[in-house]
C-alpha cells in the first residue's frame, strides 16, 4: 500500500507558495482555459488578437498582459487564411515571438511531446492556443462521456501545470440556449470539472456586438460587452461579479423592493400585480420569482413568506425596519 501523503493545516498555512500567474490579468491564468462560441462568431479573430497581445506585451480587451512567446495551433485553418488575418491586425512588424502550426498530433499520442519539444526550444513560451479541441482528440467509445472529457483535459492540465503554460482550448457551443451560458459548451460537465477557467462568447448572427462570460477557480466572475468590427474585438463595457448578480435580478423584484409599504403587505399574486400595476408578469410565476430571489429581497429589508388557506394562496411581504427606523425610543 502506498502511504497517503498529507500536510497539516498548521504547516499549510505557514508555507509560502508562489501565486498562480495570470498571463492576461483577470482572464487567462496558468492551466487550462476553455473558450466556446458559435461557429463563425469571430473566435479565431479573438484568439489571434490574444496571441499578438501577449507576444507584444500589449493590453488585450483593456486587460494587462505579460509579454511572452505564444504558439497558436490553427487546426481548422490554412496559412493563407492566417496571413490574411495578420495583414488586417498587424500594423507594424509582425512579432517573432508568435508561432503558428496548422497541423499537430493527437492528444494522448504526439501532441504532448510536440508541445514539450517546442517549449524546450522556446523557453519563453507561456501561451498555447489549440483551435479547436475537437481536432486533437479521439473519443473513446468504451468510456462514458464525462470520464472521456475529464481524462482528455487532465492530460493537458498536467502538461500546463508542469511547464507553467496557459493552454487555451477553443470549443463549440450547443445550438440550444441555456440560462447558464457555461452549460452551452459542447460535451459533458467533465470539461467544466477539469478546466481552470471557462469563457463563453455569445453573439447573434449578423450582429457586431457580443457578450463574453468569464468564470474560473482563480478569476472573478465577469461579463464583458464587446464589439466586433473589421476583425478587431473591442471592449464596450465590463461587469464584475456583484454587478452581474444585480443584472440577473428581474425588474419585477426590484419593483417589489421599492413598492412594499412600511406596514407590510399580504394577499394573492393577482392582488399584488394589480396593486403594483404590473401587467407584464404572469400571475403563475409571481411566487416562483419571489421565492427564487428571496435572498435578494432579504438583503434589501424585505422578508418574503407564503401560506395557504382554505380559500387562497397568500403572499406576505414584511419590511424589516433598520436600526435608524426603529420604533423603540429609549
Regions found by a protein language model. Give the residues of each.
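Conserved inter-motif catalytic segment of the P-loop NTP-binding fold
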Residues: 2-4, 10, 18-19, 23-24, ...
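Phosphate-binding/switch region of NTP-binding enzymes
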Residues: 19, 34-36, 40, 44-45, ...
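Conserved RecA-like P-loop NTPase ATPase core
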Residues: 28, 51, 72, 131, ...
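Pre-Walker A (Motif I) flank of P-loop NTPase domains
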Residues: 29-33, 68
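Hydrophobic positions on the alpha1 helix immediately C-terminal to the Walker A/P-loop
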Residues: 46, 50
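Post-Walker A helix-loop "phosphate-sensing" segment adjacent to the P-loop in P-loop NTPases
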Residues: 53-67, 298
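Short, conserved catalytic or adaptor-binding loops enriched in Gly and charged residues
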Residues: 88-97, 188-192, 296-297
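DNA transaction DNA-binding modules
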Residues: 222-330
